[in-house]
């Protein structure tokens, strides 16, 4: 792995922490959750929301968005320098849903960004509490990953839509810091780098001058983040090549796409954390729970326990299935969009279906949708078992996979074999081993060829009963191998649009 000296747990990244012991980490993550919860309670008071309205996930998303927008300094600066008609750069807002005379009504609210920043800081003991902001960004990113398949974005950068399991975090904003970088998939990093290289090809001055120096260091930093996700020497050596290139161009794009493809079998390390909507933290804090005192972890039992005891509601469109909406949000809560569905079904205790079989659209409601026919229902976010989240890709092996998604990116550290469609993946690697990286390419292909179906990942790791807080009795799950393993199977999920 990365040199042990520089590695920090993602709880440390999450809290910008220096080296801390487990108790300190749990306390600082708890403090972050407390801050989000207190902010949410205050916003519900400002907006005069009832308890039910405050537990509506659509209201939660609007409130989270408002605070993220209030702290988006780069965009705020841009809006002030490029005033556009009908947009007040100093204000932020969105739709808030209220129950009036037995009907759901949409109300557009507008607040001064300065006021929102004041409320946020007050809830966070006067700090900017960047970690809490990033936490909400990751929750939005996980929800996007579960709701949309990034087919168009993949095709535009010359990648294959079947590589969607590599795209975790593809909608995270650039300002999401170290915690954001930790949860980005290999494909996401590759896509960001390819976009950068393409700009350099089209714009002569992109790498030049004072700005070019900044661009270059950003490029090298992104290469290093991607390199740190790879687990084999050959993949890392390839990233060194890409990073050191004097004038990045098509050869580097080729190498990047090659390395992304290879990650379908030789998976990278991608962190997973359960980031819940603010409307879960708010009521918990309101009930008197002290997250900082009790301690909290994003990768252990805590989010599962919290969801066992939370009531969250969602607006439901006329032909949507509330159970399907619940599955969508449950997967997002556990950062499990690219996990094997058979394992998810086991942990959740109810069948988890591929995206294309779900009768549900995204959680957000567009401004032109008719509110008269909107109902609301409870989201079922409880689970049968819990499992430890992983930041490793697991070791590699093969099994029948699907026409849509041809690999998985594990979210839980649980013993199983990881499905991928070897013949489909290997077909992309015919004879393309020329050029500077030929020896690395040959080595990577050799390792991929050698990946065996029998190999088990996360050996000895199991799921745990919810009563087993100390994780003492692992239950190693058994799977029905006849079921489909991929979520975006031959898929028709909507496309993500900014």
Curated annotation (Swiss-Prot):
HAMAP family tied to this protein: INFV_NCAP (MF_04070)
Function noted in UniProt: Encapsidates the negative strand viral RNA, protecting it from nucleases. The encapsidated genomic RNA is termed the ribonucleoprotein (RNP) and serves as template for transcription and replication. The RNP needs to be localized in the host nucleus to start an infectious cycle, but is too large to diffuse through the nuclear pore complex. NP comprises at least 2 nuclear localization signals that are responsible for the active RNP import into the nucleus through cellular importin alpha/beta pathway.
Gene that this sequence comes from: NP
UniProt short sequence motif Unconventional nuclear localization signal, positions renumbered to this chain: 1-18
Native source organism of the sequence: Influenza A virus (strain A/Memphis/110/1976 H3N2)
InterPro entries linked to this entry: Flu_NP
Ranges where the record places region Disordered: 1-21
Domain of life of the native organism: Viruses
The keyword DNA-binding belongs to this UniProt entry's keyword annotation: no
Family statement: Belongs to the influenza viruses nucleoprotein family.
Reported modifications of this chain: Late in virus-infected cells, may be cleaved from a 56-kDa protein to a 53-kDa protein by a cellular caspase. This cleavage might be a marker for the onset of apoptosis in infected cells or have a specific function in virus host interaction.
Renumbered ranges of motif Bipartite nuclear localization signal: 198-216
Protein's UniProt name: Nucleoprotein
Biased composition (Basic and acidic residues): 8-21
Keywords, in A-Z order: Capsid protein, Helical capsid protein, Host nucleus, Host-virus interaction, Ribonucleoprotein, RNA-binding, Viral nucleoprotein, Viral penetration into host nucleus, Virion, Virus entry into host cell
Subunit composition and interactions: Homomultimerizes to form the nucleocapsid. May bind host exportin-1/XPO1. Binds to viral genomic RNA. Protein-RNA contacts are mediated by a combination of electrostatic interactions between positively charged residues and the phosphate backbone and planar interactions between aromatic side chains and bases.
Ribonucleoprotein in keyword set: yes
Gene Ontology biological-process entries: symbiont entry into host cell; viral penetration into host nucleus
Gene Ontology terms, MF aspect: RNA binding; structural molecule activity
Protein localization: Virion; Host nucleus
Gene Ontology cellular-component annotations: helical viral capsid; host cell; host cell nucleus; ribonucleoprotein complex; viral nucleocapsid
């Amino acid at each position: 792995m990365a040199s042990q000296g520089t590695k920090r747990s993602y709880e440390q990244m999450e809290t910008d922490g220096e080296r801390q012991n487990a108790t300190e980490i749990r306390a600082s993550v708890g403090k972050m959750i407390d801050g989000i919860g207190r902010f949410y309670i205050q916003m519900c008071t400002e907006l005069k929301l009832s308890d039910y309205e405050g537990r509506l996930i659509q209201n939660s998303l609007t409130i989270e968005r408002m605070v993220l927008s209030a702290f988006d300094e780069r965009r705020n600066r841009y809006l002030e320098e490029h005033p556009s008609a009908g947009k007040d750069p100093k204000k932020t807002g969105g739709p808030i849903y209220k129950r009036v005379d037995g009907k759901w009504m949409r109300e557009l609210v507008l607040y001064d960004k300065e006021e929102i920043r004041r409320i946020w800081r007050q809830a966070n003991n006067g700090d900017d509490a960047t970690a809490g902001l990033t936490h909400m960004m990751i929750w939005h990113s996980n929800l996007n990953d579960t709701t949309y398949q990034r087919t168009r974005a993949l095709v535009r950068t010359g990648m294959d839509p079947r590589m969607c399991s590599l795209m975790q975090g593809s909608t995270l904003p650039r300002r999401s810091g170290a915690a954001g970088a930790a949860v980005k998939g290999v494909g996401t990093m590759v896509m960001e780098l390819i976009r950068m290289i393409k700009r350099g090809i089209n714009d002569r001055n992109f790498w030049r001058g004072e700005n070019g120096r900044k661009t270059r260091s950003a490029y090298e930093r992104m290469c290093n983040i991607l390199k740190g996700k790879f687990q084999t020497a050959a993949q890392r050596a390839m990233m060194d090549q890409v990073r050191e290139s004097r004038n990045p161009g098509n050869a580097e794009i080729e190498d990047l796409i090659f390395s992304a493809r290879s990650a379908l079998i030789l998976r990278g390390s991608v962190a997973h954390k359960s980031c819940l909507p603010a409307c879960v933290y708010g009521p918990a804090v309101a009930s008197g729970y002290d997250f900082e005192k009790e301690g909290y972890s994003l990768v252990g039992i805590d989010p599962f326990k919290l969801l066992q005891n939370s009531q969250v509601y969602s607006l439901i469109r006329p032909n949507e299935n509330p159970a399907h909406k619940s599955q969508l949000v449950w997967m997002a809560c556990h950062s499990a969009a690219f996990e094997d569905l058979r394992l998810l079904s086991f942990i959740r205790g109810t069948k988890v279906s591929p995206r294309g079989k779900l009768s549900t659209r995204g959680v957000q409601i567009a401004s032109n949708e008719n509110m008269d026919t909107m109902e609301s229902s409870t989201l079922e976010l409880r689970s049968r078992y819990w499992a430890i989240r992983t930041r490793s890709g697991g070791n590699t092996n093969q099994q029948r996979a699907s026409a849509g998604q041809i690999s998985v990116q594990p979210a839980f550290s649980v013993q199983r074999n990881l499905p991928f469609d070897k013949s489909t993946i290997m077909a992309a690697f015919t004879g393309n081993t020329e050029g500077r990286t030929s020896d690395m390419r040959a080595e990577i292909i050799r390792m991929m060829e050698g990946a065996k179906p029998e190999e088990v990942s996360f050996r000895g790791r199991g799921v745990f009963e919810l009563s087993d807080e100390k994780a003492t009795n692992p239950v190693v799950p058994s799977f029905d191998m006849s079921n489909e393993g991929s979520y975006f199977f031959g898929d028709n999920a909507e496309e993500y649009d900014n």
